[in-house]
Amino acid sequence: MKEFYRQTVKEVLDRVESSEAGLTSEQADHSREKCGWNELTEGKKKSISQIFFEQYKDFLVLILIASALISGILGDVESVAVIVIVITINAILGTIQTVKAEQSLQSLKKLSGPEAKVLRDGTTVQLPARELVVGDIILLEAGDMIPADGRLIENASLKVDESALTGESLAVEKDLETLSAEVPLGDRTNMVFSGSFVTYGRGKAVITDTGMQTEVGKIAGLLKSTSEKQTPLQVNLEEFGKKLSILILIFCGILFAISVFRGEKIGSAFMFAVALAVAAIPEALSSIVTIVLSFGTQKMAREHAIIRKLQAVEGLGSVSIICSDKTGTLTQNKMTVEDYYVAGKRIPVSELDLDDPAQRFLMDYSILCNDSTNENGVEIGDPTETALINLASQHGLAAASIRNLYPREGELPFDSDRKMMSTLHRIDGKNRMIVKGAVDRLLELTEQIWTHDGIREITEADKIKIQQQNQSFSMEGLRVLAFTYREVSEKHTLSMDDENHLIFLGLIAMMDPPREESKAAVAECIKAGIRPVMITGDHKITAAAIAKRIGILQDLSEACEGADIENMSDAELKDFVPKISVYARVSPEHKIRIVRAWQEKGMIVAMTGDGVNDAPALKQADIGVAMGITGTEVAKDAAAMVLTDDNFATIVKAVENGRNLYQNIKYAIRFLLSGNFGAILAVLCASIAGLPVPFAPVHLLFINLLTDSLPAIALGMEPHSSEVMNEKPRSADKSILTKDFLGKIGLEGFVIGAMTMLSFLTGYHMNGALLGSTFAFGTLCLARLFHGFNCKSDHPVIFTKRFFNNKWLQGAFVLGAVLITSVLTVPEFHRVFKVETLNLMQLGCVYLYAFASLLIIQLLKWIRMKFRQR
């Protein structure tokens, strides 16, 4: 069956079983039984308890739970308590973030206007929007939110702002004409859509779709069917957890086999293996990563980027494609006059001279033949008309004053058939009719032209020159209005017959201009290896003109329309997207397909936008970025990040922050794993050598959860560097555990383990196993605290300013050193931590071994740096 916009008014009324008189209450009830309420439905929500328990599905967390169970069976209550506390805190943090993430459909409901004027039982009544049904006749006027989708049956110069649905900033002129061809949403001029606004005129429409069947409802369905994406960090950490668990099993198996082979009891050998497992798993890793990302969100919030989904902090730093909406994102979402063409000259608005009679006439007439107002900063009316009022205001002209000086005495409102608007005024003692409209249409009716030398007959050469200028404006993406006038007789009532014998005055060209910061932000993206792509519901020429201004597009061949990709297969689209930088006249479904096509090519995609039409693609993208000021609630709630200043440049800063945070998280992971590897190495060496276990399980948990956690968090707050923006985006499939990264962890862990083992042997030979264990415990704690400074850079930093540029790391070191020194020297701690009291000389020996590990690792970095320079 044909779409409603391709059917006549009578065919539509028959199809929805209605008439121009509307429905009766009985008919409305019957229709509601078939179609339901005019509201958006939701999928089943997860309870907070479900969300909370989902946090325990993390692979590392499951390993920790298993370790806690084994420790409990073996009677190690302290280990169980510490592990349970850590994973519970992590689950609470994850739940708080997730609970905020699924509110898109609630925001979409807000677009169903609270009330509407409807014809019911033969009279006009005001009803809640949710009670409207298919077949109802709704009455529309300027300022109304349209409550449902409908086919127009009456039209009086109706204009509708559909930017939230289509992305096009200009109000759409509506008509009653039946369309024969299949056209995009933005070109269905005989239809009105739920969630859009009437900006001008009046009309009547018969409702054709309500609730989930409206265009807004279809978007709600897309939101429900679009799955959440994992960020690269989530993928990498999951991969890391699996690899780590394999290593742990291998190490534990080796240790258990060695112990049994040496004749130890299976129970004690198993306990020994559990101690190694506890040492191998960085218990605080999940919570530390979450805390570092949380600190990152606070920093980004201060820089106008609100993070709604925690892992988006890192994910944004790895994007390689930014698919950006045009209207309100790259542009100001505000029509602005760019140029005048008057007396044969093109004049940029920056060069306007109101002492010039022609320019002053054109400005005055653009105010008089204009229905918009701007009082106390509140704009009412069509965006193109408010642009004319705003320009006058910028030049010190008050529209109200000019209108009072030359009051309107008659008018012929704009309609899409005539493509013009006329007003009558008393000017200089004469009745003057001002006519504005489409250039081609007005030139047909023009007989004279205003020049500085006076009014003369317009020639064919004049018309060609005007048409060429109009074409030039259009190719630059500018919307053009022509202004003409004529004298009419006294006490004259305007009619369409008067719209001829006109005198041409000039052209005014306007556009929704780019934001001032967009060009620089796009250039910064390209420098960082990120490709910006414009996706918009606007016209191709307009979109391409904006894209060329800001550096997204170089040639018109890089632009296409939604119709061009409509019939492409997914495989064809995947090959097509690298060639295109601008997509115009696209639907929400097109946006999702474009995002998916880039994702299938292995790209990490960010999608920016502010309208309802952007919401599904925002959710499909790896990172959805919504505008906070001009953005709809739907877009904000579907996004992972919201920009509070609507500044495209904020995205670039967010990318920089994301890259730096990922780097800092790598520092923290490097710190934790190399330290843990040192502990494993010490345990294995002792086992192979037939020596006592150098650590008690409580030692290892103390190190992992106290002296490790604070430095790791501090490394996550390492000062940011702008140098990361000189690098290309990180590959989506690149693991965080590269060979080079693992090599550094292994080498640094070896040094820490070696110093720990030497310290253990020193204490062991001094006074037996307990003192040896105390030496090993103290050295490992302090060596890992010193190691925080090693992890700040791949280069040696010990004799540079960078060694001291992180006050958080310095604080963590001092606090950790005080804690471990207290444990080693205060007798009350000895029974709990299973250590022996150290005297000053013994304590100095422990510190010396720990500091030696710092010096050795710094020396190895210096050697590596010099080797690479060669």
Predicted regions and their residues:
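Membrane-water interface at loop-to-transmembrane-helix junctions
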Residues: S731-F750, L770-T774
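Helix-coil boundary and interhelical linker segments in multi-pass alpha-helical membrane proteins
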Residues: S687-A696, F760-G772
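Conserved cytosolic headpiece of P-type ATPases
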Residues: M1-N726, I736-L737, F750, F777, ...
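Alpha-helix capping/termination and helix-coil
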Residues: N370, G602, V655, R659, ...
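Generic alpha-helical transmembrane segments
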Residues: T707, I752, T774-G788
